[in-house]
Design a protein with these regions (language model features):
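Topology signature of small-to-medium multi-pass alpha-helical membrane proteins
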Residues: 1-139
Length: 139
């Protein structure tokens, strides 16, 4: 199945996915660094639970998203696999947070539901047959 709209040989879906993932990665890297820098200031503590853990988690998540997004853009199988793995992790971690079960300390409950919806959308798109074929994932 060929997309009618392409950019540099990539379907519109891949272009949208990489732009969105790039923005998600940049925002998380920025906030991860900001939270690490501001963590020593009591006024900036996001959660009473170990703010350093959430800061490092946010930074690491952002960096992984950026790395795997570059793989998606370059049509690399590891980009697809990494994006799927990170998306599944986010769904699980945020679902645990919403259920008040042990998860990453400091994940804001207000952000969990939108992150789950976004991650499930990414997983739905990446699981489509034409995308799996592009990244040489067995169907």
């Amino acid at each position: 199945m060929r997309s009618l709209v392409t950019y540099r040989g990539r379907s519109l879906g891949i272009v949208v996915l990489t732009v969105l993932q790039f923005l998600v990665g940049v925002v998380h890297v920025f906030f991860g660094l900001w939270l690490l820098a501001a963590g020593s200031q009591p006024i900036f503590v996001v959660s009473g639970q170990s703010p350093e853990v959430y800061s490092v988690y946010t930074l690491a998540f952002g960096l992984l998203v950026l790395i795997f997004t570059s793989g998606i853009w370059l049509s690399k199988r590891w980009g697809w696999g990494g994006t799927v793995a990170v998306s599944v992790f986010v769904v699980v971690a945020d679902a645990l947070t919403l259920l008040s079960l042990p998860s990453i300390p400091g994940i804001p409950r207000f952000a969990a539901a939108p992150e789950i919806i976004y991650s499930l959308s990414m997983l739905l798109y990446l699981s489509q047959t034409h995308v799996r074929i592009k990244y040489k994932i067995s169907t």
